[in-house]
């Protein structure tokens, strides 16, 4: 996986990309991440990358030339040709399906927006605009870190466990089932007996039921689009009746 990030603040990425899973993925050559300072592609000696908006208004707008020159540089370096993404509040909401699509692309270019945004002509040159939520942050750097982390987890070999990514929340459209570890008894709260039984079939059934229940209670909006297995719809109906009887829905 080749990921190129165009940013005004490359130093922000040192911590997140130099530790944990992403660090190991880079060291093993599974993910190639390179940062490019947009100021290096400014057409003037002052390294200017922004200007006042035509028509007036507050704030500054990122100029199109430095970003275009940076994209051309990526093509010359063999890092172009992939999916070009602009991180901005107006983009499509990022989710697990988005992460899967970007991971499948093989090459990814992330443009971190800043100030009041980018010149509209930059938007015309990208393949996709992504937002990480209905809120505004200072720039696209932190959203880019989030996108890279979610995408890298889906690259084959990055996670230690072969099925690790498949068990995560949202992987099948559902929230993940509850997880437990030692001690068996903690402040009077015991680990469910089924998890100690050694009966893998019963454990899988319990986990599926808990994933359905947790999604139904916490994120019912996910249910319709989730990938359902045999018997899931009937189980959901039973769970919904139980919750209604308990006055929880």
Curated annotation (Swiss-Prot):
GO biological process, one term: tRNA N1-guanine methylation
Record-level Gene Ontology MF annotations: tRNA (guanine(37)-N1)-methyltransferase activity
Catalytic activity: guanosine(37) in tRNA + S-adenosyl-L-methionine = N(1)-methylguanosine(37) in tRNA + S-adenosyl-L-homocysteine + H(+)
InterPro entries according to UniProt: Alpha/beta_knot_MTases, tRNA_m1G_MeTrfase_C_sf, tRNA_m1G_MeTrfase_TrmD, tRNA_m1G_MTases_N, tRNA_MeTrfase_TRMD/TRM10
A single cellular component GO annotation: cytosol
Alphabetical list of Pfam families matching this protein: tRNA_m1G_MT
UniProt entry keywords in alphabetical sequence: Cytoplasm, Methyltransferase, S-adenosyl-L-methionine, Transferase, tRNA processing
Annotated binding of S-adenosyl-L-methionine, by residue: 113, 132-137
Chief subcellular location: cytoplasm
Record-listed E.C. numbers: 2.1.1.228
Gene3D superfamilies xrefs: 3.40.1280.10, tRNA(m1g37)methyltransferase, domain 2
Origin superkingdom: Bacteria
Subcellular location: Cytoplasm
Subunit composition and interactions: Homodimer.
Recorded family membership: Belongs to the RNA methyltransferase TrmD family.
Stated role: Specifically methylates guanosine-37 in various tRNAs.
Name of the protein described by the UniProt record: tRNA (guanine-N(1)-)-methyltransferase
Native source organism of the sequence: Desulforudis audaxviator (strain MP104C)
Source organism phylogeny: Bacteria, Bacillati, Bacillota, Clostridia, Thermoanaerobacterales
Gene this chain is encoded by: trmD
